[in-house]
Amino acid sequence: NNKTIPDSMQIIKDYIKENYYEELTLSNISKVVFLSESHISRMFKREFGKSIVAYINEVRLVHAREMLMNSNRSIDEICYAVGYKSRNMFYKYFKAVYGKTPNMYRRSINEKHD
C-alpha cells in the first residue's frame, strides 16, 4: 500500500518553497488549491505532521541560514529577504531551531573559517 501525497498538498509545499519570501497566509495559500483554510490546515498536518506555518518557518530558516553562511548581508536584510516582517520573530524562530541567535550563528561560522 503505497501512501501518496495528495496533489493539493504537494502544490502547497511547492508554492511555499517558491514564495517563502512573500507574505504567506492560510487565506492566500488556500486560494492556490481552491480549498478552505481549515481543510488545507487539517490535511497538511495529517500528511506532513506539522502545521503549514511551521513548514513556512522551516523553509524560511533554511534560506536564512544559507544567507548567513554565504553572504555579507546584514541580519535585518536577511530577516526581511526570507519573508519575516518582525526581527523579533525571526530571532525567536532562528534560535529555537539552531540554538543560537543569527549573529552568534554567523560568528561561529566565521570563527571556523579563520
Annotate each language-model stretch with its function.
Residues 1-2:
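Hydrophobic, helix-rich cores of sensory/ligand-binding and other regulatory modules
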Residues 5-8:
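Flexible loop/N-cap segments at domain edges
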Residues 13-14, 18, 23, 27, ...:
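Terminal helix-turn-helix DNA-binding modules in bacterial transcription factors
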Residues 32, 81-82, 97:
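Residues within the alpha-helical elements of helix-turn-helix
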Residues 36-37, 85-86:
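Short coil turns linking two alpha-helices in DNA-binding domains
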Residues 39-40, 44, 89-90, 94:
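Short hydrophobic/aromatic patch on the recognition helix
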Residues 92-114:
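…primarily DNA-binding HTH/wHTH and HhH modules…
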